Every structure is written in C-alpha cells, then in structure tokens.
Amino acid sequence: MASLRELKGRIESTKKTKQITGAMQLVSASKMSKAEQNARGFVPYADKLQEVVSSIANANTDAQHPMLMKREVKKTGYLIITSDRGLVGAYNSHILKNLVNTIEKNHTSKDEYTIIVLGRKGYDYCRKRGLPVSKSVLGVPDHPTFADVKELASETVQMYADGDIDELNIIYNHYVSAISQVVTNKQLLPIDNLDESGAATSDYEFDPNQEQILEVLLPQYAESLIFGALLDGKASEHAASMTAMRSATDNASDLIDDLSLSYNRARQAAITQEITEIVGGVAALE
C-alpha cells in the first residue's frame, strides 16, 4: 500500500492537473463558439455563390467547363483536414481511419492517389506511413481566414485543371453540435452537386458570356468549398478539444475522490496502529 506521503502527493498533483484541464476546457469552449460563428457565417456566401454557379451551369446554353465534366479517373486527390495539436480526443483518428479505409478500398497502388493535407497531425501520420503527400499547410490558425489557405486551395484546384488528378475528395469532421461531429468524405471535383433548379429560380443576364464567367467562378467556387470545410473542421476540432478536456477534468475528479478515500483509510489505519502500540506499551508497564 502506498504511504500517506505518496498518496498526499498524488492528490495534490491530480488537483493541479484538474485545474489545467479545466482551464483548457474553458479556452476550447470559447474557441468553439467563435469557430461555430465563423462556420455558420460563411454559409450564406457559399449558398449564394452556389446559386449563381448553378444558374449559369444549368442555363440553356452549350457552355461547358472541365470542372463540371466527369472523366476517366486515373488518379484521385484526397484533401484531409486535421488538427495541428493533440488533446482533441478521436478527432484526428476518425479522419485518418476514413482516409486509410477509402484508399484500401479503391486503390492498389500509390500511383493511383495523392494526398493534400491541412494540419500537422495528418501530415505526420502520412509521412510516417509512407503515404504520398503532394501539398500541405501546417500551423493553421484557430480562426483561419481565406488568405491562410488561398494558395493551397488554388493549387489543389489547379491540379485538377491540369489533369494531375481526375477527381478530388475532401475528408473532414463536419460540425453538428458541441457534442456531435461527423466524419465527412465527399467529392469536391468534378462539381456535380449543383442545384438544377437554379436556372428556373434565378433570372440572370450574363455579361460577358457564360463560358467566360464559369472560367472565373468555378475555381472560386471550388476554393470556397475547401475554405468552408476548413471552417467547419475547426469548429469540430475545438468541440472535440472541449469534450476531451471535460472528460479529463471529470476523470481527475474521480481519481481525487479515490485517492482521498485511500488516504483517509491509510491515515485511519496508521492512527489505529499508533493507538494499539500505545495501549500495548501501557499494558506492558503495568
């Protein structure tokens, strides 16, 4: 059995850990609230841009664009959004497990796919396992702006335009609520989720022509989808961090209770032993 000094030391150490995890929980909660606002605030812009693109793409015209057309898939790009730091529970492992399962299911050679990474955890994971990483951005801020990912988003879209990849999928944690985040794996390019009712619900006049507008808008739209997923993923990351720190704080409380009980029992046993020795000594003197 541990000594009273050891038990007391463990109790004090656990109390300090509890204070740290409690503070980290509050910080994560604050970051999550801001990240959630950012993610939800971006939705109206993304929806309006999709409406405009849908209206042009679905108009009665011969206008076409490679980003709207499926082609034979010889190589697939996977854009994964992970965190730069740990202490986020299963946030990263769920994304990386989904990536590995998708690769094992759809590919037999590393030549058939490449990975674009946002976040150090995903980058380190891929490098350690020898997975092909073509582009990466590390050290993404807690509340990113479009400028933070503009270069990577633009280069990734250009990879599709140049034929370096024939489709682009994105894998990230979709934010549902503070206690619920869902791993999402969806196709980003070619774009095939445009609302076909767009042309019927919106009346636009095009100047210049549709082809020229699509040439500018479609890359911007694809880049906005990447940024929107990043904002969504950041909200999920902070929610996962908050949940992990709350769980750690609760576990620390339980451990303190258990250690305190053990300490009190040990102290009681020590007192009883001392009393027994005193009584025995008195009896011997008599």
UniProtKB/Swiss-Prot annotation:
It comes from the Bacteria. One of its GO terms (cellular component) is proton-transporting ATP synthase complex. One of its GO terms (molecular function) is ATP binding. Pfam families: ATP-synt. It is found in: Cell membrane. It is a peripheral membrane protein. InterPro entries: ATP_synth_F1_ATPase_gsu, ATP_synth_F1_gsu. GO terms for biological process: proton motive force-driven plasma membrane ATP synthesis. Keywords: ATP synthesis, Cell membrane, CF(1), Hydrogen ion transport, Ion transport, Membrane, Transport. F-type ATPases have 2 components, CF(1) - the catalytic core - and CF(0) - the membrane proton channel. CF(1) has five subunits: alpha(3), beta(3), gamma(1), delta(1), epsilon(1). CF(0) has three main subunits: a, b and c. Belongs to the ATPase gamma chain family. This is ATP synthase gamma chain. It comes from Oceanobacillus iheyensis (strain DSM 14371 / CIP 107618 / JCM 11309 / KCTC 3954 / HTE831).
